[in-house]
Design a protein with these regions (language model features):
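Juxtamembrane helix-loop junctions of ABC transporter transmembrane domains
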Residues: 22-29, 52, 60-76, 80, ...
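Helix-loop-helix
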Residues: 78-79, 85, 178-192, 262-335, ...
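ABC-type nucleotide-binding domain
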Residues: 357-629
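Short intracellular "coupling" helices and adjacent cytoplasmic loop segments at the cytosolic face
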Residues: 15-24, 113, 121-145, 149-151, ...
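Transmembrane helices of ABC transporter permease
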Residues: 42-59, 89-96, 101, 160-214, ...
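An intracellular "coupling" helix at the cytosolic face of ABC transporter transmembrane type-1 domains
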Residues: 132-133, 149-158, 162, 166, ...
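Alpha-helical segments in transporter systems
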Residues: 34-37, 45-70, 86, 90, ...
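Membrane-integrated ABC transporters
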Residues: 1-61, 76-90, 104-108, 112, ...
Length: 629
C-alpha cells in the first residue's frame, strides 16, 4: 500500500447528529446559518408565502380561542343564536389556521428537499476537487455520514424544526399578549410559574444534554467495537480470543446501558416537572380567577378564555426548549457538511495541456483527429512532443510537511525505458509514483515530463497521459466493458476488446454469463482477485498511454495467471516509459534500471546483473536473505 496509509486518520467515527439532544453544538452558529440561508434564500417567493401562512396559522390558533369569551357570555345570557354564530366564527378561524398550517408545511417540505438536493450535489462536486491528502486524513465512513445522516438532519431542520420553533414563538408571544389583555394582574401568577418552568428547562435540560452526549459517545464506542469484531472474526478465532472479546463487549455494553439509563432519567423528568407546574399554575389561576369573577372583576366568558390561554401558554415553552436543542444539533450537522465544502480544493496552476497533433517529420500541427500522436501545448502556443521522458532532480517530499519520506531522490526514465522500484514496505516506492501524477506536490526539487515541470502541466492533462494500475483494484457498478472503458470513456467496443486481449483478460470475460455485458456489482465481488486485477490492467491498456505506472500490478495474481499476462504486458509496455513496483522480483528482472529504496533514499541503482554482482540490498532481497515486504 501507499506509504501515506500509515498516517493518522482524523475525524473519528463521525456519524453526524441525529434528532436527539446528545450531539455536539455548532462551533460557528452564525456562519453556518448564514450559509444555509444562502441556499434557502433561492426560494424567496415560496418563503414569503410560508412566512404569511406561518403567522396566520399561529395567530389564528390563538385568536380562535378568544371566541370562547363571547360564546360563554352568550350561554350565560341564553342567547343561543349569538352562540351559534360565534361557534361558526370560531370554527372558521381554526379552519383558516389549519389550512395555513398545511400550506406552509407542504411548502417547507418542498423547499427542504430542493435545498438538500442542491446541497448534496454541491458536496459531491466539492469532493471531486479535493486533493488526495484530504482523503488520507478523513475516514470514508465519516464522509459518507455527511451525505446520509447530516443531510437528513438538514432536511428535517428546514422542513420541520425551524418552522416549529418560529410557530411556537409566535404562539407564545400571542398567548401572553392575550393573557395580559384579559387581566394583567392575574397574568403575574402565570409569569411566576413560567419563570419556574424556565428554571426547570435550564437545570434538567442542561443535565439531560450532557447525559445524552455521554450516551451517544458510549453508543459510538459500542458500535465501533461491534463492527471491528465482526470484521476481525477470523483473527479472533485463530488466536482463541473469544472470551476476551465477550468481556470487552460486556463492559462497553454496560457502559452504554448506564449512560442511556441516566439520559432517559433526565429526559423523563422534564415533561412531568413541566406538566406539574402547569397544572399547579392552572389550579391557582382557577381559584384566583374564580374569586375575581365572583367579585365582578371578571365575567364568566373572560374567565373561561383566560383559563384556556393558561392551559396553552406552557406548551410552547417546553416545545421550544426541546426544539432549540434539536435545531442546534441539526445546525451542527449542516456545519459538518460545510466543513467539507469549505476545505481547500486541489490547486492547479498548470497551463500546459495535452492535445492531438499531426506529425510530419519534426513538424507538429494541432488537430482534432485521432492520429495516435500527442503533444504538450504551452501557454505561448508552442508544442512539445509527448515522448514520456520523466526526470526527478533532488526531490524531497513528506505527506506530513514535518516528516520527510523521500530524501534527495534523483532519477530519469527516457522514452521506452522500464524503471523498476524495489524495497521493503514503506521504503517510498509508491510515493514516487504518486508524485509523477501529482497526487501530491513535492516540498523541494523538480520533476519534469518531456522537459516541462509537472507543476506547469494541467493535472487533468498530466493524468490523461498516464496509464496507472493501482495496487488496490476498484471496479465500479456496471458492465465489464464499462469498467474497461473507464480508462478511456470514448473507447469503441473494438478498442475495449483489444485492450482485454492485450491484458489476457478476454478469455475469462468471454466465459462470463453475458461476456463483456456482464454487470459487475459490489466492487467485483463475484470475480477472483486475479480477474479483477486483469480488468484493471485492461483499463490502463485501453487509454494507450505513453507512460505506464504498475503499482504492485501483479501482486494479487497467482503465478499461473502472472505467466499468462507476461506476454500481453510486454506488448503493452513496448515503446512506453514504464515504472514498475512489484513484490515479485521476477517481474522486474528485465528492467533497464532497477532502483532500490530504503527509508526514502535510493541506495542502489543498475540493471539486474549489475546489482546482483554488488551483493548489496538487492542481492539480499533476491536471495531471500531479506523480505521484500
Amino acid at each position: 500500500m501507499a506509504e501515506n496509509k500509515n498516517q493518522a486518520r482524523a475525524g473519528g467515527p463521525g456519524h453526524g447528529p441525529g434528532r436527539g439532544h446528545g450531539y455536539q453544538r455548532p462551533q460557528n452558529l452564525r456562519g453556518t446559518v448564514g450559509k444555509l440561508l444562502g441556499y434557502i434564500g433561492r426560494y424567496k417567493g415560496a418563503l414569503i408565502v410560508v412566512a404569511v401562512c406561518l403567522v396566520l396559522s399561529s395567530v389564528g390558533s390563538v385568536a380562535g380561542s378568544y371566541f370562547l369569551k363571547p360564546a360563554l357570555n352568550y350561554i350565560a345570557a341564553g342567547n343561543f343564536t349569538g352562540l351559534f354564530w360565534m361557534l361558526v366564527a370560531m370554527g372558521g378561524v381554526f379552519l383558516v389556521s389549519a389550512g395555513c398550517s398545511y400550506a406552509y408545511s407542504r411548502l417547507m417540505v418542498r423547499i427542504s428537499q430542493r435545498t438538500v438536493a442542491t446541497l448534496r450535489q454541491d458536496l459531491f462536486n466539492r469532493l471531486q476537487t479535493l486533493p488526495l491528502r484530504y482523503f488520507d486524513t478523513h475516514q470514508s465512513g465519516d464522509l459518507m455520514s455527511r451525505f446520509t445522516n447530516d443531510m437528513d438532519t438538514v432536511s428535517d431542520m428546514i422542513g420541520n424544526s425551524f418552522a416549529s420553533v418560529v410557530s411556537n414563538l409566535i404562539t407564545f408571544v400571542c398567548t401572553v399578549f392575550m393573557l395580559v389583555y384579559l387581566n394583567w394582574a392575574l397574568t403575574l401568577i402565570t409569569f411566576v410559574f413560567l419563570g419556574l418552568m424556565l428554571l426547570v428547562v435550564k437545570s434538567v435540560g442542561g443535565r439531560s444534554r450532557v447525559s445524552f452526549q455521554q450516551q451517544q459517545a458510549a453508543l459510538g464506542s459500542l458500535n465501533g467495537y461491534i463492527e471491528e469484531m465482526i470484521e476481525g472474526q477470523k483473527v479472533i478465532k485463530v488466536f482463541h480470543h473469544e472470551q476476551k472479546t465477550l468481556d470487552e463487549f460486556s463492559a462497553r455494553n454496560s457502559a452504554y446501558r448506564d449512560a442511556a439509563a441516566m439520559a432517559q432519567t433526565y429526559a423523563g423528568a422534564m415533561m412531568p416537572a413541566m406538566g406539574n407546574l402547569s397544572r399547579i399554575n392552572y389550579a391557582v389561576t382557577c381559584c384566583v380567577g374564580g374569586l375575581l369573577s365572583i367579585s365582578g372583576v371578571f365575567d364568566i366568558g373572560s374567565l373561561g378564555a383566560y383559563l384556556l390561554y393558561v392551559k396553552q401558554v406552557s406548551q410552547p415553552v417546553g416545545q421550544i426548549s426541546q426544539q432549540v436543542n434539536t435545531l442546534l444539533a441539526e445546525v451542527a450537522g449542516a456545519e459538518r457538511i460545510f466543513a467539507v465544502m469549505d476545505a481547500d480544493p486541489e490547486t492547479d496552476d498548470g497551463t500546459a495541456t495535452l492535445v492531438r497533433v499531426l506529425k510530419d517529420g519534426d513538424t507538429l500541427t494541432e488537430t482534432d483527429r485521432r492520429t495516435g500522436h500527442w503533444a504538450w501545448k504551452k501557454s505561448d502556443g508552442s508544442l512539445t512532443e509527448l515522448r514520456g521522458d520523466v526526470r526527478f532532480e533532488h526531490v524531497d517530499f513528506g505527506y506530513d510537511p514535518e516528516k520527510t519520506v523521500l530524501h534527495d531522490v534523483s532519477l530519469f526514465a527516457e522514452p521506452g525505458q522500464k524503471i523498476a522500484f524495489v524495497g521493503s514496505t514503506g521504503a517510498g516506492k509508491t510515493t514516487i509514483t504518486n508524485l509523477i501524477n501529482r497526487f501530491y506536490d513535492i516540498q523541494s526539487g523538480v520533476i519534469t515530463y518531456d522537459g516541462i515541470d509537472v507543476r506547469d502541466i494541467r493535472k487533468d492533462s498530466l493524468r490523461r497521459s498516464l496509464g496507472i494500475v493501482l495496487q488496490d483494484t476498484h471496479l465500479f457498478t456496471g458492465t465489464v466493458a464499462d469498467n474497461i472503458r473507464y480508462g478511456k470513456l470514448d473507447a469503441t467496443d473494438e478498442e475495449v476488446r483489444a485492450a482485454a486481449r492485450l491484458a489476457n483478460a478476454d478469455t475469462f470475460i468471454r466465459h462470463l454469463p453475458q461476456g463483456y455485458d456482464t454487470v459487475i456489482t459490489g466492487d467485483g465481488g463475484s470475480l477472483s482477485q486475479g480477474e479483477r486485477q486483469l480488468l484493471a490492467i485492461a483499463r490502463a491498456a485501453v487509454s494507450d498511454p505513453p507512460v505506464l505506472i504498475l503499482d504492485e500490478a501483479t501482486s494479487s495474481i497467482d503465478t499461473r495467471t502472472e505467466k499468462l499476462i507476461e506476454k500481453g504486458m510486454d506488448s503493452l509496455m513496448a515503446g512506453r516509459t514504464v515504472f514498475v513496483i512489484a513484490h515479485r522480483l521476477s517481474t522486474v528482472r528485465n528492467a533497464q534500471a532497477i532502483l532500490v529504496l530504503e527509508q526514502g533514499r535510493i541506495i542502489e541503482r543498475g540493471d539486474h546483473a549489475a546489482l546482483m554482482a554488488q551483493k548489496g540490498k538487492y542481492y539480499q532481497l533476491c536471495t531471500g536473505q531479506e523480505e521484500l515486504s
